[in-house]
Amino acid sequence: MSLFDHSVSELHKKLNNKEISVTDLVEESYKRIADVEDNVKAFLTLDEENARAKAKELDAKIGAEDNGLLFGMPIGVKDNIVTNGLRTTCASKILANFDPIYDATVVQKLKAADTITIGKLNMDEFAMGSSNENSGFYATKNPWNLDYVPGGSSGGSAAAVAAGEVLFSLGSDTGGSIRQPAAYCGVVGLKPTYGRVSRYGLVAFASSLDQIGPITRTVEDNAYLLQAISGIDRMDATSANVEVGNYLAGLTGDVKGLRIAVPKEYLGEGVGEEARESVLAALKVLEGMGATWEEVSLPHSKYALATYYLLSSSEASANLSRFDGVRYGVRSDNVNNLLDLYKNTRSEGFGDEVKRRIMLGTFALSSGYYDAYYKKAQQVRTLIKNDFENVFANYDVIIGPTTPTPAFKVGEKVDDPMTMYANDILTIPVNLAGVPAISVPCGFGANNMPLGLQIIGKHFDEATIYRVAHAFEQATDYHTKKASL
């Protein structure tokens, strides 16, 4: 039995009782990485020397009264979150040798909580992708079956947790990039409310949509991690000055009287029968615990996919203009003048999907097309947000599938961008509305790959979706299933 089969609270108790050491936890992580990483390929960079040194330092503090619950816990960090002195590439060759000179706010907070960073996790390049096949280095595989994708863009973050390489990880979610891989890998992933967690130090893809969040084995562990990284940050102008409550207090298993909305659009055309049936089964479980549910409509959700790709690509075209070979990152050697420097550096450094989205965004923002595309997409985004607000006026949470289907095979959709984009059709509306949502395991498809239940909450009401997710988790055994890698 792995130490990582225990929860954070159980491991914390074992540490305080000196049944285990922090070094034991770190070595457990690196041993597992040595055993499975050649197949899973979840990590881009390991930080073994510093992690082991930090473990020895913390071993001397075991039993101290001020040790928090995350003391000594091993964590993986998605490679678009900057880490001081530890290579951060965004899985792009244009940043292949980039060593940041500061820590992201979330990394600072986790260091203050005495967690130990095991390494940086693989992803789709600049977080643009749904399968991890767009990494500029190598594709991560799904621990449940290495022939399948782990999802994206936080595929490495989800796969590392599912494979038992780390206890938990950080990912980022722009259109489903935490929740979709969490669903595909059978783990728990939360996208917080926009502004709940600081984005300072997150390499920007689409600044109005990006959000950092936790990926864990259980809902309780997820709540511990969000508790540690939440809160206002003066370094992030979009960080919200909203009180962070006690997320653990509501994990009672009680959902009696809870009002659940189920959008008909989330169970209709384009959603596979397996995903639909798993959600209906989950609703029966919650109904048996005293919750009620009704079908509702989010009428503008059918425009979410087009709206998202116009807005996110437009923001990406602006954000990624900084990677020009002048200030940092890889610089092309094939240069005769300044124009060559810009063109050749970006042509050689960016992958095909990143180039595709930059071109789409540049077109949408260009003179003559701005009003027809970007401005119109912003107007539709407002309508989508209003749809959520209208539903939340009468209901506590919204529930549906996280993804239309279980994970698909490696290479199955890589040459068909539109089919690939459609994998996020159920997660994208949440980012456009800025509300929080969590994915928890809720079953398996005919291919024996996990399915995820998506629970969506009101702005800054992560506590309620944790309450529902935890109640469902404890009433079922899906969270106890492990990839047999």
UniProtKB/Swiss-Prot annotation:
Any one cellular-component term (Gene Ontology): glutamyl-tRNA(Gln) amidotransferase complex
Molecular function GO terms recorded: ATP binding; glutaminyl-tRNA synthase (glutamine-hydrolyzing) activity
Organism superkingdom: Bacteria
Keyword Protein biosynthesis recorded: yes
Keywords, comma-separated and alphabetical: ATP-binding, Ligase, Nucleotide-binding, Protein biosynthesis
Active site: K78, S153, S177
Gene3D superfamilies in the cross-refs: Amidase signature (AS) domain
EC class of the enzyme, as a word: ligase
SUPFAM superfamilies the UniProt entry points to: Amidase signature (AS) enzymes
Subunit and interaction comment: Heterotrimer of A, B and C subunits.
Family: Belongs to the amidase family. GatA subfamily.
Protein name, as recorded: Glutamyl-tRNA(Gln) amidotransferase subunit A
Lineage of producing organism: Bacteria, Bacillati, Bacillota, Bacilli, Bacillales
